[in-house]
Amino acid sequence: MPKGIIGKKIGMTKVFVNGKAIPVTVIQAGPCYVAYTRTQEKDGYNAVALTFGERKEKNIPKPLLAIFKKANIKPAKVIKEFPLKDGETVEPGQEIRIENVFEKGDLVDITGKSKGRGFTSVMKRWDFAGFPKSHGHRYHRAVGSIGCRTEPGRVWKTKRMAGHYGNETVTVLGLEVVDIIPEKNVILVKGSVPGAPNSTVFLKQSVIADRRKGKLKLAKSKAMYA
């Protein structure tokens, strides 16, 4: 089985576990279908490409459409490769469901596109404090000084200034799987997830699960939810 799956963010709610309210994000994860596989002998690595969603055939590039037809699956909106778990194999056209990949108490890393906020000031983009709110000046939300004089005679790269904010790829590490509802292809993840409702997200086995703090968090999560 793959080490990840593709899903769609539905929204947020809360569930009660042992009398404690847990804020969770609801994600419709799968069902996904295998488009093709990569092997160590032929490609140099082991992976599987999963598809999610639907798309009109007329809007699909012909090379990609040929992949879907070869696997005997419907044209999909999203296609992405995931590494395979050790010693496991899948076949093109095979259905992958959320319960095949994750279980309660697992730690997952979730990648998505953050909400786009357009051109914003430094107070919103970088959390600047701004100037005093008293009267007598007009610089309440201004950026302030952006450099020196003759030396260096320019604005340093990476200087925090106003500009485009959001609409970036963001990954949140080590989120806990609170519950899985197989009959609805739904997974409940503790905390917030990047992106707007109905946006595509990618769920993967967490990279922090093998670290010391990650192992402690995983054991605590398993004891609470599993």
Swiss-Prot record:
Keywords: Ribonucleoprotein, Ribosomal protein, RNA-binding, rRNA-binding. Disulfide bonds: none annotated. InterPro entries: Ribosomal_uL3, Ribosomal_uL3_bac/org-type, Transl_B-barrel_sf. It comes from the Bacteria. GO terms for biological process: translation. GO terms for molecular function: rRNA binding; structural constituent of ribosome. One of its GO terms (cellular component) is cytosolic large ribosomal subunit. SUPFAM superfamilies: Translation proteins. NCBIfam families: L3_bact. Part of the 50S ribosomal subunit. Forms a cluster with proteins L14 and L19. Belongs to the universal ribosomal protein uL3 family. One of the primary rRNA binding proteins, it binds directly near the 3'-end of the 23S rRNA, where it nucleates assembly of the 50S subunit. This is Large ribosomal subunit protein uL3. The gene is rplC.
